Amino acid sequence: MIYTRQQLEEYESQTLASYAVHSKDSKGRLHPEEEADFRPRFQRDRERILHTTAFRRLEYKTQVFINHEGDYYRTRLTHTLEVAQIGRSIARSLGLNEDLVETICLAHDLGHPPFGHSGENALARLMKDFGGFNHNSQSLRIVTVLEARYPDFPGLNLSWEVLEGMVKHETDYDITEAKQFNPELRGHLEAQIANLADDLAYTSHDLDDGLRSGMITPNQLDGIALWEIINESIGRRRSETLDSLSRHQIIRRLINFEVTDLIQSTDRYLRRSNVKTALDVQKLPFNVAGF
């Protein structure tokens, strides 16, 4: 059996929450294109990002530890994949558009330079007389201009909702380009979830990498409420050595704890806010996704 794009969009209408962004309701693309026969818009956007040069280049870009310190530690690429996995899991539980969340997650770090935030700060200083440098702005520039893959338009010609989600990655006024994307409105719920998935991914895996490298010791974390809760859940006492199995258990339970809290809290806020549509979410005076 073959499912056409229209059938997949109809399936979205039947299964996604009313406050989710539905593919068929997209504002479209800057440059008109024929729709795909078998892929909804955001699935198509996701696949365009995966095939970019910028996405492949994330492999050797620093997250925290530079590459020669070991192949265990996260890079921008592995971080991005973990963000996408967490974002998609949350989206599924909340009835959101998984393809849209994952697409924003996959695109959110495309503009990062080498050497992590140190590299970004160095570029910002060097470019201060020319508008500075911001990795969020660069991510948008990559997908709208620099990735030259089509003869009829610059960039990837991604859907409006993907670009809006990238622009409003942290707040509704993240970068100057936000003025093109209804700055008076907050990001749609898929954008809010993508942002929080980023936070959850880097806090958990930075802790994992820090503990494995020895730069963070368990003694430094003793007394922190969440650390104590997670350790108690696996039956580990303060005096015990943190072996690799215990570390993996802790990180796994930490991610599950935070994801569960985010899903339950966001659902609670949605019910209290009585939102019915994606636009209702954007008109709220606060981000409805949270802990």
Task: Give, region by region, the residue ranges found by the protein language model.
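Histidine-centered, transition-metal-coordinating active-site segments
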Residues: 1-80, 84-90, 97-98, 136-291
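Short coil/turn segments at secondary-structure boundaries
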Residues: 67-78, 91-92, 106-114, 127-130
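His-Asp-centered metal-binding catalytic motifs of divalent-metal-dependent phosphohydrolases/nucleases
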Residues: 94, 98-119, 139, 198
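A generic membrane alpha-helix/interface feature
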Residues: 113, 126-127, 216, 274
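Short helix/strand-bridging catalytic loops that position acidic/His residues to coordinate divalent metals
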Residues: 121-129, 181-183
